[in-house]
Amino acid sequence: MDRKVVNATVALQDVWCGYDPAAPGGDMTVTRIGPHTLYCTDAYDLRPRLGYFDAEVMDPPYLFKASGGGAFRKSRDILDQIVEEGLDKGFDHTIINPLLCGAVFTFCHNDQLADLLPYLNGSFHRYAVCFWRKPNPLPMANKHYRADLEVYIHAWNRGFHPQGDLTDRMRMVESRSHRDRSLGHPTVKPDVVMDKIVRNAAGKTVIDPFMGTGSTGVAAIRAGRIFTGIEKNPKHFETAVRRIGAAYAGVN
């Protein structure tokens, strides 16, 4: 990857892109932007080798049926992209390791809660089920409830309980869905949502093993945290590098 994929306002001495045999994942693309490190590879292989982080923030693949939707479904290219990229197949919960993070924030589909909550409850000191409320949900229900709420779970070890003032500690955050397709990813989370999550996270270091186009990294950098991201899709990885490079330039 050429350094030019990073926003041009970032000083070149603060950016390194290429292969680093001395680092975990030496056989993959590694990009460093100041103190922040991005890996283009599979998270299940690399994440355990990266060690401990204060906060793990992730939007992993959901597990749901992408069929149905009636006449409206025919025009839903977002769902088609989700299926093409395998983002409807769920994820292996064991990538969340309570020995490798102080706390985890993970989005999930409603149908994943029955399996995910017992796993987190048995792994962490406490957890809370939180919600992102969308005032502009897709106009469909597909023999279910409308997707006006999206679930995320915050589970933490002792000492990594929710941070922020009383307003920050609300279990619900409201923001319109991100309908800007320019980022090329079907499930981009809004800045308002990610900023709130990072404010609730204790500690200094943040990792996102399913980085996508870098929304967690942007929020982490703006909050003064040190970010590490992993993304296996090269196209999304390049978008994340550009966005995180711009965020880093904006605070330096």
What are these regions (language model features)?
Residues M1-I207, M211-N252:
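Class I S-adenosyl-L-methionine-dependent methyltransferase catalytic core
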